[in-house]
Swiss-Prot record:
S-S pairs: none
NCBIfam families: pept_deformyl
Cofactor(s) demanded: Fe(2+)
Positions annotated as active site in the UniProt record: 155
Protein name: Peptide deformylase
Protein's job: Removes the formyl group from the N-terminal Met of newly synthesized proteins. Requires at least a dipeptide for an efficient rate of reaction. N-terminal L-methionine is a prerequisite for activity but the enzyme has broad specificity at other positions.
Pfam families associated with the record: Pep_deformylase (PF01327)
Natural source organism: Lactobacillus johnsonii (strain CNCM I-12250 / La1 / NCC 533)
The family this protein is said to belong to: Belongs to the polypeptide deformylase family.
The organism's place on the tree of life at top rank: Bacteria
Gene3D superfamilies linked: Peptide deformylase
EC number: 3.5.1.88
Length: 184
């Protein structure tokens, strides 16, 4: 079971590396990693389990965040009622296209690997088209928008050596383009 002490923290070079693609069939080790990453997200969103194990809630977890520099990320995205609206493990994801219009979260973003609060808007594409492989090697292409697109973009950034605060305007952290959609 992945716990908070297993999460790679900001400052570790693995978080700034471009993760290597995986080949299929996945080894048992990587299949277990995928399961463990998803289980962390499930556990972290369950208040009783999260409190018992002192887990910070997460909606996404990329392999570099647990010290593995490989192209894999788990996403477990709830809606505002707590119902899961997107659940998947991406292997070797690639953004095929993205909207010009940007979106961001009103409260900014956080990250399991970043312990401090970093204020500012994190503009991301409002819509994404992503090609990825499942753990079983099935190729899929999906379209995401709004919050699921934000989460997917955040996790794919991890696979490319970027952290959310890299996207914050350094001169004016709360400045946005006029047509940016702010999600509360």
């Amino acid at each position: 079971m992945i716990l908070m002490h297993d999460i790679t923290r900001d400052g570790n070079p693995v978080l700034r590396q471009v993760a290597k693609p995986l080949t299929f069939p996945l080894s048992d080790e990587y299949k277990k990693l995928a399961d463990d990453m998803m289980q962390y997200l499930i556990n972290s969103q369950d208040p009783k389990i999260a409190e018992k194990h002192q887990l910070r809630a997460g909606v996404g977890l990329a392999a570099p965040q647990v010290g593995e520099s490989v192209q894999m990320a788990a996403l477990l995205v709830p809606n505002d009622k707590g119902e899961i609206i997107f659940k998947e493990v991406f292997v070797n994801p690639k953004i095929l296209s993205e909207s010009v219009r940007r979106t961001c979260l009103a409260e900014g973003e956080g990250c399991l690997s970043v312990d401090k609060d970093i204020e500012g808007y994190v503009p991301r594409p409002d819509k994404l088209k992503i090609r990825y492989y499942t753990v079983d090697g099935e190729e899929k292409t999906i379209r995401l928008k709004d919050y699921p697109a934000i989460v997917a973009s955040h996790e794919i950034d991890h696979l490319n050596g970027h952290l959310f605060y890299d996207r914050i305007n350094k001169q004016n952290p709360f400045e946005l383009a006029e047509d940016t959609i702010v999600i509360s």
